[in-house]
Amino acid sequence: MTTRRDALAALKGTLARLERGVMPSALPHFSLGLPELDGALGGGLTRASLHEVFAASPAHGPSATGFALALAIRATPSAPVVWVRQRMFDQEFGRPYGHGIAALGLDPGRLVLVRARHAEDVLKAALEAARCTAVGTVLAEIWGSPKVLDLTASRRLSLAAAASGVTVLATRVDAAPAASAATSRWQVRAAVSQDPQTGLPGLPAFSVTLLR
């Protein structure tokens, strides 16, 4: 079985190889695709910072992940996306599906997927990835409210993002918002998705509330 040290060493090797690739965009904001919302946010969401996405309840966890992936696509047009996922998400919702990710708009070839058993390991891997200047976005998924994910941990992620230019998205399920260094905080619920012409399920839809 791969140890935590081995997993982190493998991630460091991957990030070192990525550093020889495409650098992330230098634009300070990325658009959400809605002019009214972008305007209210001063041009969109800021890159090189930490943003939190909370599921309204555990049942809405897949929607929170989908919304976070949509933000990652917006933030990262071409650079790699590092997705660090606590294994609890796989157990509850199933593993990521390549064709579904592609249908959402993210080329699976740009995705580096890291699975970790504990929240502490997720934070370590996410922090390591956030320090790599060749990464576009880091998506970190953590279940519950572990003690290791405190204000200090969020500050470390925020500072790493600011130093490297990487955008960090933290998806939280079965957790209540608490003090953090996040620039924005969202709450996500599933919404009805229906094609107006056929009445069949259409594009992914989310009910989103900007908490901060």
Give the label of every model feature segment.
Residues 1-82, 94, 100-109:
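Detector for small/aliphatic-rich hydrophobic stretches
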Residues 33, 64, 93, 122, ...:
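Helical mechanochemical/support elements of P-loop NTPase systems and associated helical scaffolds
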Residues 54, 84-85, 113-116, 139-143, ...:
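Conserved beta-strand segments of the P-loop GTPase G domain that flank and frequently precede/overlap
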Residues 57-60, 88-90, 119, 144-149:
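Short acidic, S/G/P-rich loop/turn micro-motifs used as interaction or catalytic elements
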Residues 74, 129, 160:
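Hydrophobic/aromatic ligand-binding patch that stacks against planar heteroaromatic rings
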Residues 79-136:
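Conserved inter-motif catalytic segment of the P-loop NTP-binding fold
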Residues 134-179:
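A contiguous pocket-lining binding segment that forms or flanks enzyme active sites
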Residues 170-212:
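Phosphate-binding/switch region of NTP-binding enzymes
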